[in-house]
């Protein structure tokens, strides 16, 4: 039976691995900062002592970071990542227990990952309500890369997702994955999108752009991993080049695919059109000036980048993944194309490039759509869920 929260003076601990740059991490900081005004005490506890996003918080005293411990470099959460995390579970258990002892939370909110299993088990012993956030389709991602392990991984995830008292899915597609494929009761799953600090992003977007962001360009933003599909974007740009519609391409982010992407651009003869400057702490100043933002992911549970680009007025071309298809309305505020189809991606981008009226229409609609994910609106939905778990 779900443990009930006390409606007054409730204490909530958000437990995250680290604050390395990423959508999951920005979601945590944005929520914890905004929810401070709710009357509850919210804390963000980290299992690892690093992350550039620590500077993003407006409430540093509510950020609980260890001074030492293991450091995991940002990478895709695949089967190899999960296996490599096993030796760190002892540290995670010690760290999680220390945070629980310090905060004494009534509610524990975590993202999904191996650390969650440890933290959730500890929270059970303290009597805290455990809510897990699922923001990516780990089942599809790992099953496609390791089909031989699909049955075992399905059983593992099914068992893991039964343990939280409640689950928040970042999109309707993720909710269906949990309930239809992994056997999670629909009564235990809510759909709440990621929050976006629209006002703060629009303020940042007015800052001068980086020196390399001059002229017309198409923008990609994200971790440079296979899952993000930036190789498809480069191939699409090469098609446009061959069709005598060259466009400059800027891809922001770091990751193991950075050099392979450079090599691909050289191989396709468009190295002079592709810029890979690395991690950019303020991508919004480029989003506001881009001809279009392209999100070519192979898997995407939500997509903070798409909503942030919309908040900056950037027209969007995205692939038909769980999150993007629920954010982008083709022909209204952007274009959605099939996953993995570089020809369709090139075609969708070319249509935007040759139709300035369409770009202008998308910009206006995108600005309106972004407001639906504004942090005030989304955090109200989270607080409603938290209060539903509280004793009247």
Protein language model regions, located:
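N-terminal strand-loop element at the rim of the active site
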Residues: 14-22, 28-30, 34-83, 188
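A conserved mid-protein helix/loop that constitutes part of the nucleotide-sugar donor-binding site
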Residues: 25-30, 216-239, 249, 256-263, ...
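Nucleotide-sugar donor phosphate/pyrophosphate-binding loop at the beta->alpha transition
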Residues: 90-92, 129, 139-163
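Short His-centered aromatic/hydrophobic patch
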Residues: 110-116, 134
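Carbohydrate-associated surface elements
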Residues: 173, 195
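Aromatic "clamp/platform" in nucleotide-sugar-dependent glycosyltransferases that forms part
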Residues: 279, 298
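Short hydrophobic beta-strand element within catalytic cores of glycosyltransferases
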Residues: 315-318
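Conserved acidic donor-binding segment of nucleotide-sugar-dependent glycosyltransferases
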Residues: 330-331, 335-342, 351-356, 371
């Amino acid at each position: 039976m779900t443990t009930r929260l006390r409606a007054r003076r409730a204490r909530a601990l958000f437990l995250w691995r680290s604050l390395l740059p990423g959508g999951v991490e920005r979601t945590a900081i944005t929520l914890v900062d905004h929810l401070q005004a709710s009357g509850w005490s919210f804390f963000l506890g980290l299992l690892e002592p690093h992350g550039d996003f620590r500077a993003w918080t407006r409430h540093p005293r509510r950020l609980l970071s260890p001074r030492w411990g293991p450091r995991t470099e940002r990478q895709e959460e695949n089967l190899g990542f999960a296996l490599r995390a096993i030796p760190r579970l002892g540290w995670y258990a010690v760290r999680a227990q220390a945070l629980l002892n310090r905060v004494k939370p009534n509610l524990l909110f975590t993202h999904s990952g191996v650390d969650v299993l440890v933290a959730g088990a500890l929270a059970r012993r303290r009597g805290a309500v455990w809510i897990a956030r699922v923001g990516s389709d780990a089942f599809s991602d790992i099953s496609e890369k390791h089909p031989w392990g699909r049955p075992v991984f399905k059983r593992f995830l099914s068992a893991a997702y039964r343990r939280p008292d409640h689950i928040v899915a970042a999109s309707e597609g993720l909710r269906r994955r949990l309930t239809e494929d992994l056997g999670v009761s629909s009564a235990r799953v809510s759909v709440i999108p990621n929050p976006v600090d629209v006002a703060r992003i629009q303020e940042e977007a007015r800052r001068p752009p980086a020196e390399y962001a001059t002229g017309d360009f198409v923008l990609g933003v994200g971790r440079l991993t296979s899952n993000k599909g930036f190789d498809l974007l480069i191939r699409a740009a090469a098609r446009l080049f061959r069709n005598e519609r060259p466009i400059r391409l800027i891809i922001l982010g770091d990751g193991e695919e950075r050099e392979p992407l450079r090599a691909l651009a050289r191989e396709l003869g468009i190295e002079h059109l592709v810029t890979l400057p690395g991690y950019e702490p303020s991508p919004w100043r480029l989003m506001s000036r881009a001809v279009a933002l392209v999100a070519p992911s192979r898997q995407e549970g939500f997509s903070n980048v798409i909503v942030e680009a919309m908040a900056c007025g950037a027209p969007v071309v995205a692939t038909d993944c769980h999150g993007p298809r629920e954010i982008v309305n083709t022909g209204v505020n952007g274009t959605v194309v099939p996953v993995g189809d570089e020809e369709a991606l090139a075609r969708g981008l070319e249509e935007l490039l040759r139709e300035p009226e369409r770009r202008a229409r998308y910009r206006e609609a995108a600005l309106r759509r972004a407001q639906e994910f504004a942090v005030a609106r989304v955090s109200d939905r989270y607080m409603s869920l938290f209060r539903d778990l509280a004793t009247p």
